[in-house]
Amino acid sequence: MKKNNLSDVKKANRQLVYECIWSHKSVTMTDLAYVTHLSRPTITSLVQEMTADNLVIKSGYGTSNGGRNPVLYHANVNAAYAMGIDLEFPKVRMAISNLECENICFSVRIYPKDADKDQVLQLMKQ
């Protein structure tokens, strides 16, 4: 059985909090602490790290029955991108999408039938 060190626990907690933010779309730190069963200081630290890493964004303020309005957080869907390339004669299709699978960029290029690999790569760079 593998022992968990502090680094492993922190990574697991960070992943748990990020998945909670992702699935709830807009959530407060109090909600995160309730759902994840982590302490408020742990949640605060992890959310600050993820905000600094641009994974999480402040999305506004929630409502309160008294006191300060809580800050709402949501996942930054543009924190990372995926790229897909489809090479099929006689064309190259390329797409870039964000974390919500929204197309950011889509391109189709036609290459000549006698093109070699270097010409196809050059066409893709354009």
Residue ranges and their predicted role:
Residues 22, 47, 106:
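Non-catalytic beta/alpha edge segments that cap or flank active sites
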Residues 26-58, 68:
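N-terminal helix-turn-helix
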Residues 69-106:
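Gly/Thr-rich phosphate-binding beta-strand-loop-beta motif of the actin/hexokinase/Hsp70
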Residues 106-126:
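N-terminal phosphate-binding loop and adjacent alpha-helix
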Residues 24, 62-65:
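A short, glycine- and basic residue-enriched loop/turn
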Residues 65-67, 126:
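Short gly/ser/thr-rich secondary-structure transition/capping motifs
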Residues 1-35:
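Extreme N-terminal segment that seeds HTH/winged-HTH DNA-binding domains in transcriptional regulators
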